[in-house]
Each structure stands twice: as structure tokens, then as C-alpha cells.
From Swiss-Prot:
Family: Belongs to the PlsY family.
GO biological process, alphabetically ordered: phospholipid biosynthetic process
HAMAP family for the chain: PlsY (MF_01043)
Bilayer topology term: Multi-pass membrane protein
EC number: 2.3.1.275
Function: Catalyzes the transfer of an acyl group from acyl-phosphate (acyl-PO(4)) to glycerol-3-phosphate (G3P) to form lysophosphatidic acid (LPA). This enzyme utilizes acyl-phosphate as fatty acyl donor, but not acyl-CoA or acyl-ACP.
Organism per entry: Mannheimia succiniciproducens (strain KCTC 0769BP / MBEL55E)
Gene name as annotated: plsY
Highest taxon in the source lineage: Bacteria
Subunit details: Probably interacts with PlsX.
InterPro entries linked: G3P_acylTferase_PlsY
Subcellular location as annotated: Cell inner membrane
Keywords, comma-separated and alphabetical: Cell inner membrane, Cell membrane, Lipid biosynthesis, Lipid metabolism, Membrane, Phospholipid biosynthesis, Phospholipid metabolism, Transferase, Transmembrane, Transmembrane helix
GO CC term, one of those recorded: plasma membrane
Name the UniProt record assigns to this protein: Glycerol-3-phosphate acyltransferase
């Protein structure tokens, strides 16, 4: 691995550490996502605490902070392994942000953004898997875990030279969801739209 690639990975980590969920919630007057809803500073939790447009802004920002470094690294001539490490650095920054006491999000949107420049086909398969599981179950966490588990196989089939680094990213995503997996096993995980259903029920009373 080149010295330039190592410096680039560090810069990517610092970029990934910018938590859009925390900053945007502060900007629009929403509660701190680390203290509300699921406690996760990510787009899904921002949606839970009532900010649809804020959640969309968070989602776009988190995707871009994974996508832009990998895309630029590709044109700067980084090797597939180095690009994979850049993707991992972006996710590590999002999950363990240095600016916010290393308490970050789950990394799904950032991982999607980082994988997209490798292959739009892989990104589409990843998104399609997430969407199908979400529509069938209503659980964002379950959708993310299953998408993370199958994405390395998509990569192996389409762009095999990226299989190992992408598998590392996906393992990180699964690890980051270990608490969600436990709640799913116990039947205690909330569906994304559960909050909105409760709100509608309370308004109808």
C-alpha cells in the first residue's frame, strides 16, 4: 500500500467522521438523534424522530461521504485493495467519528455510497435486496444485515478483485448491527413505521 493511499485513507476517515444526522438535527431544531428514538445518529432514526426532509438530507450526505472519496481514489489510480480500504475508512469514520466521541451511526448509507463507484450493478443489487426485505418485514435493521451478508457474493460475481475489501466493510456493518440482531431475535425491534402508526392512532382518539 502506498504512502499516498494511507494519507488518503486518513483524510477519508476524517470526512466520514462528519455526522450529518447530529449537525442537521441541530440546524433544524430536532432532538439529538443519539438521545432520541433508537439512539442511532443515522437517516432512519432522524425519520423516526419526525424529520422527513432532514432524514433525506442526512441520507444524501452520508451516501456522498462514502461515494466521493472512492470515486476520486479510482481516478487517482488507487488499486482495488486501496479503494476498498478507502471505503472501509469512510465507514469507520461514520461509525466511530472522532468529532463526536466515536459514537456514530450504523454505516449502511455510507457503505452503499462507497460501493456504488465500484459497480452500479452491485449498488443496484444491494439496494434491491435492502428494499425487498424492508417491504416484506418493515425492519430497516434486518434489511441492512441481509444486504450486507449477500453483497460480497454480488461483488465476487461482478467485480471479484474487490471481494475482500468489500467483505470487510460488510462484516463491519453486521457487527455494528449486533444489538439490532439481538432485539430481532427477542422480537423487540421496532419497525420503521411503528412510530407513525402510533402517532396516527393517538390523533384518532
Amino acid at each position: 500500500m502506498s504512502f499516498f493511499a494511507i494519507l488518503y485513507m486518513l483524510a477519508t476517515y476524517f470526512l466520514g467522521s462528519i455526522s450529518s444526522a447530529i449537525l442537521i438535527c441541530r440546524l433544524v431544531g430536532l432532538p439529538d438523534p443519539r438521545q432520541s428514538g433508537s439512539g442511532n445518529p443515522g437517516a432512519t432514526n432522524v425519520l423516526r424522530i419526525g424529520g422527513r426532509w432532514a432524514a433525506l438530507a442526512v441520507l444524501i450526505f452520508d451516501i456522498l461521504k462514502g461515494m466521493i472519496p472512492v470515486w476520486c481514489g479510482y481516478y487517482l489510480g488507487l488499486t482495488p485493495f486501496e479503494l476498498g480500504m478507502v471505503a472501509l475508512s469512510a465507514c469507520l469514520g461514520h461509525i466511530f467519528p472522532i468529532y463526536f466521541k466515536f459514537r456514530g451511526g450504523k454505516g449502511v448509507a455510507t457503505a452503499f455510497g462507497a460501493i456504488a463507484p465500484i459497480s452500479w450493478g452491485i449498488a443496484g443489487a444491494m439496494l434491491g435486496t435492502w428494499g425487498i426485505i424492508f417491504l416484506l418485514s418493515g425492519y430497516s435493521s434486518l434489511s441492512a444485515v441481509i444486504a450486507a451478508l449477500v453483497t460480497p457474493f454480488y461483488v465476487w460475481w461482478i467485480r471479484p478483485e474487490f471481494t475482500f475489501p468489500v467483505a470487510l466493510v460488510c462484516c463491519l456493518l453486521v457487527y455494528r448491527h449486533h444489538e439490532n440482531i439481538q432485539r430481532l431475535w427477542r422480537g423487540q425491534e421496532d419497525k420503521v413505521w411503528a412510530k407513525f402508526k402510533k402517532k396516527e392512532d393517538s390523533q384518532g382518539e
